[in-house]
């Protein structure tokens, strides 16, 4: 019997935690990673070199590799603010940019680097071109650029993408749709709802594949609400927004953390984008027609509240070995 095929879709700092745990399991693992980041080092590189932003891809490469910690630390090394043009760039971002330019494609660069770093699984950027994220707010205002969305401080109605260079509709990378169609289980998140997960899903080919796939679709619900994105959101609100963007109720299962976050770990000075713990609304979740798995998925570290990758991975593997939740 072949290993279950698990596809994880997202970006940011959320999915690397889960991918690092999943790569140790007996599964066929694939990561599909957002390329809509336009802030910080990634934003500067995509403007200078005209490639898909490397930051989220760098974190996923490291999470899925068996490289020693010292090698990972080298890739994560961020140049000091006194280092002129290099200031703020992680070395790994510059390496991805260089290989992307050499090979004329971020997709090809990631495949090369995945071999080089002994990645266990497959990594695909959701698109091979840099994308611009558009957020349309409830008041009709529209904000362009992932890094600018939270600062508007309005209620987001929906998001969509365009290719940064041409303004055209985005196109999925090679093998992305195939991976979704052949998957046994698809995992969305964890991560920022509007700026890490949805920038993959609203690529038309990916959205259509999520409609058509026979895979079980699992959403790992965020533990904390996020400033400028999901303020006052319940767990059901997160699921509802995902289903609305896809166009139908495709989420089969949601993983919900029920462990309380201690007050002292809601550190808005250190983690200023996170606000309070996500409220539970089990009646509304029932209306979204999802199977709810409630458990302690909480890990307290670095002064903040995060997902415990091992606990999440355990549930994902268990779901992948069952058939009853296939939609």
Swiss-Prot record:
GO molecular-function terms, A-Z: LPPG:FO 2-phospho-L-lactate transferase activity
Q: Which organism is it from?
A: Lactococcus lactis subsp. lactis (strain IL1403)
Q: Tell me, what does this protein do in biology?
A: Required for morphogenesis under gluconeogenic growth conditions.
Stored CDD domains: CofD_YvcK
Q: Which gene encodes it?
A: yjiF
In the record, the note on similarity to other proteins reads: Belongs to the gluconeogenesis factor family.
Q: Which UniProt keywords are present, listed alphabetically?
A: Cytoplasm
The family database entries (InterPro entries) matched by this protein are listed as: CofD, CofD-like_dom_sf, Gluconeogen_factor
Do you know which SUPFAM superfamilies this protein is assigned to? Answer: CofD-like
Q: Which domain of life is it from?
A: Bacteria
Q: Name one GO cellular component term.
A: cytoplasm
Subcellular location(s) of the protein? Cytoplasm
GO BP, one example?
Answer: regulation of cell shape
Among Pfam families, the record links this protein to:
CofD
Protein known as: Putative gluconeogenesis factor
Question: Keyword Cytoplasm on this protein?
Answer: yes
Carries keyword Cytoplasm? yes
């Amino acid at each position: 019997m072949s290993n279950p095929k698990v596809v994880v879709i997202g970006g940011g700092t959320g999915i690397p935690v889960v991918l690092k745990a999943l790569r140790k399991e007996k599964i066929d693992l694939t990561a599909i990673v957002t390329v809509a980041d336009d802030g910080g080092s990634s934003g500067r590189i995509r403007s200078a070199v005209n490639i898909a932003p490397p930051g989220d891809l760098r974190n996923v490469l490291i999470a899925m590799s068996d490289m020693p910690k010292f090698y990972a630390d080298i890739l994560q090394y961020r140049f000091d603010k006194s280092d002129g043009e290099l200031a703020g760039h992680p070395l790994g971002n510059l390496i991805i940019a260089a290989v992307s330019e050499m090979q004329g494609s971020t997709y090809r660069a990631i495949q090369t680097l995945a071999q080089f770093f002994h990645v266990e699984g497959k990594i695909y950027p959701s698109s091979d071109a840099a994308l611009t994220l558009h957020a349309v707010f409830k008041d009709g205002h529209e904000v362009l650029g992932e890094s600018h969305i939270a600062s508007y401080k309005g209620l987001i109605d929906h998001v969509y993408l365009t290719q940064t260079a041409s303004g055209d509709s985005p196109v999925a990378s090679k093998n992305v749709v195939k991976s979704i169609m052949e998957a046994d289980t698809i995992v969305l998140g964890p991560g920022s709802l509007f700026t890490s997960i949805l920038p993959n899903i609203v690529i038309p080919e990916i959205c259509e594949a999520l409609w058509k796939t026979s895979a079980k679709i699992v959403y790992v619900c965020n533990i904390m609400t996020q400033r400028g994105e999901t303020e006052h959101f319940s767990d059901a609100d997160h699921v509802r927004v995902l289903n609305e963007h896809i166009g139908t109720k495709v989420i089969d299962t949601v993983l919900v953390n029920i462990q309380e976050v201690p007050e002292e770990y809601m550190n808005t000075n250190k983690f200023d984008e996170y606000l309070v713990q996500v409220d539970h609304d089990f009646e509304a979740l029932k209306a979204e027609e999802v199977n709810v798995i409630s458990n302690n998925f909480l890990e307290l570290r670095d002064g903040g509240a995060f997902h415990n990758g091992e606990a999440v991975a355990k549930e994902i593997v268990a779901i992948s070995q069952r058939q009853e939740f296939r939609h």
